[in-house]
Amino acid sequence: MSDAQALGIKNSNEANGALNGSYASVSVGSQTLKVPVIIQPGQAKGTVGLSFGYGERLGLEDEMQTGVNAYALYANFKNVQNVEVKLDSGEHEFACVQLHNTLMGRGDIVKETTLEVFNTKDKAHWNLMPQVSKNHIEFDVTSPEVDMWQEFDRSIGHHFNLSIDLNSCTGCGACVVACHAENNVPVVGKSEVRKSRDMHWLRIDRYYSSATTFEGDNQTKEDISGIGDSLNTFGEMEKAASNPQVAFQPVMCQHCNHAPCETVCPVAATSHGRQGQNHMAYNRCVGTRYCANNCPYKVRRFNWFNYPSYRKFTEVNPAQDDLGRMVLNPDVVVRTRGVMEKCSFCVQKIQTGKLVAKKAYRPLVDGDVTTACSDVCPSNAITFGDWNDVESDIRKSSEEKRSYQALEEIGVKPNIWYKVKVRNEVNEELVEIQTAHGHGESHGDEHGDAGHDAGDNHGDGGNHDLDTGHGNGEGDHQPSGH
């Protein structure tokens, strides 16, 4: 039994998926704080985690005063305290939209291996080619001989790509904040987030393993036989392990070369540019939301309201304040109600970089253009640049043997790369499973070349949203796992 169960602390979901949680009283000596509880797997038994940085009162309006000051319990600045936790009255409404926490064996989305396997085995063992089923037989995905898309020579001019190293990503969220600031992404407030109306152009999917390791999940899925076994096993795989592995995966618009959003827009509001970007023409968009329905990555966002001016959002959207409007980026249009929006690869920064190079009478060189997310990433997990520049960091990154593109089997050919996560740990289970893998040694050292010159780009698959934190910070603490 977990600590949360023993204390009677629960998290529950409303019909629309919105997350609610119990309150608890946390006491150290004579100091007691009433805080909401969000239950997370992997929390060590007998411990709680309490967030600092909330509870500020001075200089803030009432609606901005959120949470409690946890420093009251931080006696003598000791990380370990003798804490008493009790169930308290009330129910807290969390702004958390990441409700499905496990991959359930979909290892082609977040790929990982151990350092031992990485150093001793061919990439066919740990960076497997995705497969599709034909007549109940699995086949490696290859570029189709017949393609109904009208292709053009992508080697002419610039072709911008982005690479994300899952080894380096810590899930800190700096990229999400930078994206909001750079692209005037509206702040919608806690109640809208609970309705899954968040506007993040970039989210960070957080996954827990349902077995000891993610590769263990994949093996469990492979061992499933029959409908009955499938229902029972997948039901169990929805639950995270008590001591799971954790992986973070930033997900934004993949700027697919064969973008499914472009083919369904009835007014051609979204289209593909020669530089590899999927563009949005806001003044053409009529808000059908067909593009969002047809996006396999769920990265498009719809403006349900006119967030920058509607009085309902005055308390949560700083852009409605005279001072707050001064931080809006004048190079990016502020969208209005009924318009779809998404990641643009910071097209305004690309155009600025090209203009600077033009005024200097020189060609664009690697490093001239960056995105907001790649600029601020503290671990340098995000690389951006011109893929057609053979000496660029992005070209070299995409051609590394760790590079892959998730969901490449659906054939949308995106311009986002991910790198296999390598864990520096002793994991006999993972070594045994991946040593047995290797359904073909041909995942291709020239994966990057095929990705563009032959039109063999691929795709990503995190279908969750970021734990947004709009109003989610009232001293949230985490008792032990489920």
PLM regions: where:
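Short, flexible loop/turn elements at secondary-structure junctions
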Residues: 3, 28-30, 41-43, 54-56, ...
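Long, contiguous, secondary-structure-rich segments that constitute the structural scaffold
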Residues: 3-161, 167, 178-181, 442, ...
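Active-site lining segments that contact anionic ligands and/or coordinate catalytic metals
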Residues: 19-23, 32-34, 45-47, 80-82, ...
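Surface-exposed acidic, glycine/proline-enriched linker/cap segments
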Residues: 145-146, 203-206, 210-248, 314-335, ...
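Beta-propeller domains
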Residues: 157-160, 164-166, 170-186, 192-209, ...
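Iron-sulfur cluster-binding cysteine motifs and their immediate structural context
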Residues: 174-193, 203, 258-284, 290-310, ...
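Flexible glycine/proline-rich, aromatic-decorated loop/lid segments
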Residues: 199, 303-322
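Long, compositionally biased charged/polar accessory segments in the mid-to-C-terminal portions
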Residues: 320-323, 338-452, 460-467, 473-482
